[in-house]
């Protein structure tokens, strides 16, 4: 089975035949601006669920887990913040009692990873996570698709404050391009 699987996996294409160009020298100073440009491109070419990302968290013992979530919003950098001092606040939500909620309660560091296979692109966002207010969490719960008016006191809106945002563009020649913003 192992050799058969290995051959089948090796036969699969890694990336699409046509990949978008990316020149890091032309990237904006603000990673949110570049993310939004890549996100809009993913929407325009029909990438399914471009707002979905994998969230990796860890326990106090460094046991890592990840799961798929939906990006709720990106709040812009604090007004008056100098360039490169604040990469905005990337929002997502879950129940506090879930595994991710418990892990974030113990270890508030996390990583988001957006992957747009059809474009050969991914964006990794790493930083500290904080809880938003009960009011903001309740409003997010009420605005969910299919909301039925019931209250969920365990629902929590979180925001990740990036210390690092990395953009990765696949290249057919395997000289993949990375562009990192680090605070």
Model-derived regions, located:
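Charged, gly/pro-rich active-site loop segments
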Residues: 2-26, 121-183
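A generic structural motif
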Residues: 56-60, 72-74, 113-117, 168-170, ...
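Tryptophan-centric aromatic hotspots in well-structured domains and transmembrane helices
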Residues: 37-38, 90-92, 116, 153-158, ...
């Amino acid at each position: 089975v192992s050799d058969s699987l290995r051959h089948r996996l090796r036969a699969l294409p890694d990336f699409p035949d046509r990949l978008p160009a990316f020149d890091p020298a032309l990237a904006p100073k603000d990673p949110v601006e570049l993310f939004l440009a890549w996100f809009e491109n993913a929407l325009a070419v029909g990438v399914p669920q471009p707002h979905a990302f994998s969230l990796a968290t860890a326990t106090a013992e460094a046991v890592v887990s990840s799961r798929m979530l939906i990006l709720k919003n990106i709040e812009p950098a604090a007004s008056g913040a100098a360039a490169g001092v604040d990469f905005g606040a990337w929002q997502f939500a879950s129940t506090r009692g879930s595994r991710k909620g418990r892990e974030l309660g113990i270890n508030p560091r996390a990583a988001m990873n957006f992957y747009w296979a059809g474009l050969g692109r991914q964006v990794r966002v790493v930083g500290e996570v904080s809880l938003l207010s009960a009011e903001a969490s309740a409003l997010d719960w009420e605005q969910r698709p299919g909301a039925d008016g019931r209250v969920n006191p365990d629902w929590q809106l979180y925001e990740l404050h990036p210390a690092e945002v990395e953009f990765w563009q696949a290249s057919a020649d395997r000289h993949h391009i990375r562009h990192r913003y680090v605070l």
